[in-house]
Amino acid sequence: MYEDLITEIPDFPIKGVNFKDISPLLADEQAFRSAIVEMGGLYYNDVGVPDYWVGIDSRGFIFASALAIYFGGGVILARKEGKTPGDIVSVSYDLEYGSATLEMQKVGMGGGEVVIVDDVLATGGTLKATNELAEKAGYAVAGNLVLIDLKYVPRVDNFNLDVRSVVSYV
């Protein structure tokens, strides 16, 4: 069902990358609602409602917010460097060609369980860094949740996270 609403854009954002565009799925109210219910259900039966859903910049924000509204819990944003005001905690990590930094605001930090949410899992570098960021901020990571898992993409070194997904491409 969801695969019909996920289009592939060849050579975007760079040559050799086939981008999975979720815009048609997000525009379809019934499919989007169904995806949120299915995503949340992957954890709800095991851990219940986390204290927070951590959305990864930027499309993870969409899913984390919708999950929080539907299932309960708050939303915390894991943002790209320089996008977060105030008192922050940060983690830097390596990309295939360079490095990046994620930041999280310290507002409301005091522990609790989080589920980390993103739209797509490819190499796992950003998801792994977000786990480190959440733990550095004092949260217990209950799990990782993505809409799409690109299982055919090689993972970063030492990637051993439990990730649950609604759609997988092998």
Predicted features along the sequence, with ranges:
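Generic enzyme active-site microenvironment
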Residues: 55, 116-117
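Active-site-facing substrate-recognition patch
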Residues: 1-49, 105
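Conserved G/P- and acidic residue-centered "switch" motifs that form tight phosphate/ATP-binding loops
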Residues: 119, 124
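PRPP-dependent phosphoribosyltransferase catalytic core
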Residues: 4-5, 128-170
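Conserved acidic residues
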Residues: 51, 112, 142
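Short Gly/Thr/Asp-enriched flexible loops that form oxyanion-binding sites at enzyme active sites
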Residues: 62-71, 131
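Short, glycine/charge-rich flexible loops or terminal/linker lids adjacent to PRPP-binding catalytic cores
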Residues: 73-115
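Short glycine-rich phosphate-binding loop at a beta-alpha junction
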Residues: 48-57
